[in-house]
Amino acid sequence: IHGMVHCTGGAQTKVLHFVSDNCKIIKDNMFPIPPLFKAIKECSGTDWKEMYQVFNMGHRMEIYVRPEVADEIIKISNEFNIDAQIVGHIENGNKSLTIKSEFGTFEY
């Protein structure tokens, strides 16, 4: 395990506090957004980009590992009835985060 991020108190952009300057994070396979967050967006008028900065959007924990061990971690999570999936990857590049969701692509 190279890193773990609990996505509350910093939401989907929290990871940017913990990666080096040459890490470009791509999250392009996010979990479906629970209805609660859609209701918050609708009632508040907040745009989707800010929603991903403020709320975890139903995506609570990230574990950063090498691709070859990801399936085993997902299997262990599922044994405890915890949904898990690969949500993205890291590339070499300038420190940044790209979130690709059903509501658009957001750069941070």
Question: What positions do the PLM features span?
Answer:
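Glycine-/charge-enriched secondary-structure boundary and capping motifs
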Residues: I1-Y108
